[in-house]
From Swiss-Prot:
Protein name: Omega-conotoxin-like ArMKLT1-02
Taxonomic lineage: Eukaryota, Metazoa, Spiralia, Lophotrochozoa, Mollusca
Domain of life: Eukaryota
Keyword Disulfide bond: yes
GO molecular function: calcium channel regulator activity; ion channel inhibitor activity; toxin activity
Membrane-crossing segments per the record: none
Role played: Omega-conotoxins act at presynaptic membranes, they bind and block voltage-gated calcium channels (Cav).
Record's subcellular location: Secreted
Family: Belongs to the conotoxin O1 superfamily.
Positions annotated as propeptide: 23-51
Swiss-Prot/TrEMBL domain comment: The presence of a 'disulfide through disulfide knot' structurally defines this protein as a knottin. The cysteine framework is VI/VII (C-C-CC-C-C).
Leader peptide range in chain numbering: 1-22
Tissue expression profile of the protein: Expressed by the venom duct.
Length: 84
């Protein structure tokens, strides 16, 4: 019983200590999201915009739709153009 009470008091103390000594995390997250949004407005800031894809007629592997290896995302052992 005494050990349980001591554990509860210790957990409460450590929880309170964490909240008292923590930085203002809400404003820190807001700043982080604002910075991320500013970077995304500049399209050249994102390395995801540069795709390394294969041109039409190049080997792409197993045939399936939405193949990220092909710029057209259509693979039939070779990259094929999208149908209109």
């Amino acid at each position: 019983m005494k050990v349980t009470c001591m554990m509860i008091v210790a957990v409460l103390f450590l929880t309170a200590w964490t909240f008292v000594t923590a930085d203002d995390s809400i404003s820190a997250l807001e700043d982080l999201f604002a910075k991320a949004h500013d970077k995304m407005e500049n399209s050249e800031a994102s390395p995801l915009n540069e795709r390394d894809c294969r041109a039409l007629g190049e080997y792409c592997g197993l045939p399936y739709v939405h193949n990220s290896r092909c710029c057209s995302q259509l693979c039939g052992f070779i990259c094929v153009p999208e149908s209109p």
